[in-house]
């Protein structure tokens, strides 16, 4: 029994937070969670994949029982503080980058509107150049608290393939994340039988057969290997993770970047109120204006929320179950008149019970909290610089507050 958006208590409704993947864009989800806490919205279930899975694990297993939101923000600030700043190099190269990529034309300034457009264009240029620089920094040096390049000399003694890079299947080791997360996660909270914490669901994909892998704290002990698995994105050049003998996992975002279906499968009886964080917005207002924005928009579509069909089917199934309920009540009220044998009666009742246990949940409400994109750029999800992380956290909190306030006024 938990508070709704107006502060009233509702029985038999699960509050669910669904967190998408998206690299450094996961800081937006941190801000969203901060807003939910401030509005006293208790969560029953948290599901995530990739960086969303990392966020979810920190929230559900937080070592700070009273303020998991503060601990999650601390995690993101720690990542940003370990971002390798290459400003001295880029101070030298930036003018050339700007000239080559953005300033090889004369922008006319014949009226106030054009001046305003020019100022806005220059601002966008500066942000995009900064994101490009941040990407190069992460690619070259990694992030000590998250991932390290495999070519660093410290791996020479421990990596048997260090001197044969033609055999490499990954470029970055994200096992440093384990030590970092130990400061934030109490794994004893992420196991069956611990009902005082939100249920945690992480998703991954089996490298060999492409089937979904679901890690559910109500069914198994969640360990650091499961968090590494859900964030093992091969196109970021992270390695697969062996989660069981012979079972090798990659990032769940390869199958679905929005693990809503897994939530419905895991908890099929209790109705849901869903808060869905969209790091990659489904809808935008304008077409791309250059090839970089074309690639950016294509990526947004690939990783955007595609659960509309799941939501529609959930509602269709609810209508069917309501109809079955009506028919079943007619059956029970007239069972004696039907003169059915005991085996047939028992079979009908078993089927009725199974249908309700397997598919009884309904999505009562769903709140989409979508990140706005003022200056779209293909490298935005690799920018772990302090200013960007702080801005993402703030924008997530602001957007969540806006969505919650809008629903309260309805």
Protein language model features and the residues they cover:
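Patatin-like phospholipase
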Residues: 1-49, 58-410
């Amino acid at each position: 029994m938990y508070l709704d958006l107006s502060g009233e208590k509702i029985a038999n409704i699960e509050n669910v937070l669904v967190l998408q993947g998206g690299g450094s864009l996961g800081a937006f989800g941190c801000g969203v969670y901060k807003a939910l806490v401030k509005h006293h919205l208790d969560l029953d279930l948290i599901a995530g994949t990739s960086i969303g899975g990392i966020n979810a694990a920190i929230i559900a297993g937080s070592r700070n029982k009273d303020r998991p939101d503060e601990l999650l923000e601390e995690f993101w600030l720690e990542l940003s503080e370990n971002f390798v700043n290459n400003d001295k190099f880029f101070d030298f190269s930036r003018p050339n980058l700007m000239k080559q990529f953005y300033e090889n034309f004369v922008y006319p300034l014949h009226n106030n509107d054009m001046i305003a457009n020019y100022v806005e264009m220059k601002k966008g240029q500066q942000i995009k150049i900064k994101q490009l620089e941040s990407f190069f920094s992460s690619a070259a040096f990694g992030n000590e608290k998250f991932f390290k390049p495999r070519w660093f000399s410290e791996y020479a003694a421990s990596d048997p393939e260090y001197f044969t890079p033609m055999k490499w299947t990954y470029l970055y080791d994200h096992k440093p994340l384990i030590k970092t997360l130990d400061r934030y996660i109490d794994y004893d909270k992420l196991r069956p039988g611990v009902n005082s914490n939100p249920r945690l669901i992480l998703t991954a994909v089996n490298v060999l057969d492409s089937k979904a892998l679901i890690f559910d704290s109500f069914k198994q002990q969640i360990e650091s290997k499961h968090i590494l698995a859900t964030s093992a994105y091969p196109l970021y050049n992270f390695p697969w993770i062996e989660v069981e003998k012979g079972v090798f996992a990659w990032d769940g975002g390869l199958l679905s970047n929005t693990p809503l279906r897994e939530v419905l499968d895991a908890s099929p009886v209790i109705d849901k109120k869903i808060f869905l964080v969209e790091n990659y917005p489904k809808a935008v207002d304008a077409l791309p204006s250059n090839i970089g924005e074309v690639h950016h928009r294509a990526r947004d579509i690939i990783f955007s929320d595609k659960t509309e069909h799941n939501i529609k089917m959930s509602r269709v199934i609810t209508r069917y179950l309501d109809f079955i309920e009506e028919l079943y009540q007619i059956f029970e009220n007239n069972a004696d008149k039907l003169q059915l044998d005991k085996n047939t009666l028992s079979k009908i009742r078993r089927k009725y019970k199974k249908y309700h246990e397997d598919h009884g949940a309904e999505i009562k409400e769903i709140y989409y909290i979508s990140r706005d994109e003022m200056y779209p750029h293909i490298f935005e999800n690799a920018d772990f610089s302090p200013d960007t992380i702080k801005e993402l956290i703030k924008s997530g909190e602001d957007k969540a507050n806006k969505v919650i306030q809008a629903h309260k006024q309805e």
